[in-house]
């Protein structure tokens, strides 16, 4: 892969030094997206036409409408500057990973929420669900024991595709929170015209996607 023009180091060493921070952010964001997205989608379908459903749909619309860097700046302003609860700069794990993972995972959570709701509503209207209800099974068993397993099949496919999107989105989020990962290295390489690093990082992201 060659040597970095800026750092005079092999590109593989730069990848090795910074890939961990990016993957921490990506996996944490995926966990946030799955937890919030699936939870909101399931509750929205089960509580259809209630305030829970409407709130989840509003979240899904707003989540995919706002750009991630804007969401990141708003979260920094609220939780780091105004409230002072969380650090504005993310260079590690634990509390320093909360704001970046929330920022990056919001859009993916919104997508998963809409897909989960649609899939759950489709399954809940199936014949075998009506049969299970007619036999007198509890609604909790019908939803969690029968409907959810089939409703998650298309959702799991999208979760796999979202991983690549989160990895690519880490470029912007690492710049917002000054996280020392591959995304920040890519931005620095672009501004300094460090072409070997740019080529290596783009190839790395393409292979993972």
Q: Which residues fall in each region the model found?
A:
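Alpha-helical transmembrane segments of multi-pass membrane transporters/translocases
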Residues: 12-20
């Amino acid at each position: 892969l060659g040597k970095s023009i800026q750092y005079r180091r092999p590109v593989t060493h730069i990848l090795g030094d910074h890939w961990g921070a990016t993957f921490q952010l990506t996996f944490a964001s995926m966990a946030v997206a799955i937890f919030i997205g699936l939870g909101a989608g399931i509750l929205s379908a089960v509580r259809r036409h209630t305030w829970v459903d409407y709130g989840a749909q509003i979240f899904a619309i707003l989540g995919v409408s706002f750009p991630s860097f804007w969401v990141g700046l708003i979260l920094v302003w609220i939780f780091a500057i105004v409230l002072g609860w969380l650090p504005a700069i993310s260079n590690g794990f634990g509390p320093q990973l909360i704001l970046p993972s929330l920022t990056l995972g919001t859009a993916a959570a919104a997508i998963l929420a809409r897909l989960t709701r649609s899939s759950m509503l489709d399954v809940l209207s199936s014949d075998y669900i009506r049969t299970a209800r007619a036999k007198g099974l509890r609604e909790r068993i019908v939803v969690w024991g029968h409907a959810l397993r089939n409703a998650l099949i298309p959702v799991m496919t999208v979760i796999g595709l979202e991983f690549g999107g989160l990895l690519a989105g880490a470029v912007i989020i690492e710049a917002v929170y000054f996280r020392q990962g591959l995304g920040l290295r890519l931005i620095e390489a672009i501004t300094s015209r460090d072409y070997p690093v740019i080529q290596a990082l783009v190839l790395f992201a393409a292979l993972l996607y």
